[in-house]
Amino acid sequence: MTENTAETADESSDGGVTATTGAATTTPTTPPEPVIRARDLDVFYGSERALESVDIDIPEQQVTAIIGPSGCGKSTFLRCINRMNDRIDAARIDGDLTLRGTNVYDAAVDPVALRRRVGMVFQEPNPFPKSIYDNVAYGLEIQDVEGDHDEIVEQSLRRAALWDEVSHQLDSSGVALSGGQQQRLCIARAIAPDPEVLLMDEPASALDPVATSQVEDLIEELAEEYTVVIVTHNMQQAARISDKTAVFLTGGKLVEFGDTDQIFENPEHQRVEEYITGKFG
């Protein structure tokens, strides 16, 4: 009779015997790859440097807030992700910025195809002078998105928490909606092509408190499906809705990045604490 012990013998591939213990081995977990990664990212407008040596890893299906004083490079960084800076003749981008491991500035990357993967919502609601339906369906048509467009439009409006308010008037003009409804329409338009990332540049700054609250609730819901990166001047908003916060300060430098609770409750850098507590900015 063979006695059971904590040590067992396994036959190796070369015929030998390898002793292994019965103790459980813990395999270190590898952190998931970030959706967006920047390394040594610099942006220049002519001779003026807008971003300097930015390193950041943005995680999947979380809300990452970008905060900092005016002119610190927040929106410039956001526009790098979907190459909106390409439209500025004097802009020059150095360094690496990857989306799921692919450098978005590689010559083989089509900016139009990139923007299908990376949707964007701007500061001011900007619905097209079209019907509510056509506002959402427009991106599907120009990007040749397959599938039932009626169904996609409805799903997008539902995800943007707008369907119940407009389902009876899809042929009405999008510009006739209230400001908050217009912004949610723009969000529906941005998510209709089913992007991986949703960029939001001060999406609630032009809205009243009620509409702002609706958009904030929506952002938290959208993070269950999308990676959301939001630029905001409203630090209370960043604290309420984001999982991660990046703090840019003068000169386009990313000074601190981490969990939002840690950034707001116990920042590592004095300048970050001074900015958050309103001593400058």
From Swiss-Prot:
Residues 1-34 are annotated as: Disordered. It is an enzyme of class 7 (translocase). Belongs to the ABC transporter superfamily. Phosphate importer (TC 3.A.1.7) family. It is a peripheral membrane protein. Residues 36-276 form the ABC transporter domain. Its EC number is 7.3.2.1. One of its GO terms (biological process) is phosphate ion transmembrane transport. The keyword Translocase applies. Pfam families: ABC_tran. It is found in: Cell membrane. It comes from the Archaea. Residues 15-28 have a biased composition (Low complexity). This is Phosphate import ATP-binding protein PstB 1. It comes from Halobacterium salinarum (strain ATCC 700922 / JCM 11081 / NRC-1). ATP binds at G68, P69, S70, G71, C72, G73, K74, S75. Part of the ABC transporter complex PstSACB involved in phosphate import. Responsible for energy coupling to the transport system. GO terms for molecular function: ATP binding; ATP hydrolysis activity; ATPase-coupled phosphate ion transmembrane transporter activity. InterPro entries: AAA+_ATPase, ABC_transporter-like_ATP-bd, ABC_transporter-like_CS, P-loop_NTPase, PstB-like. Coiled coil: none annotated. GO terms for cellular component: plasma membrane.
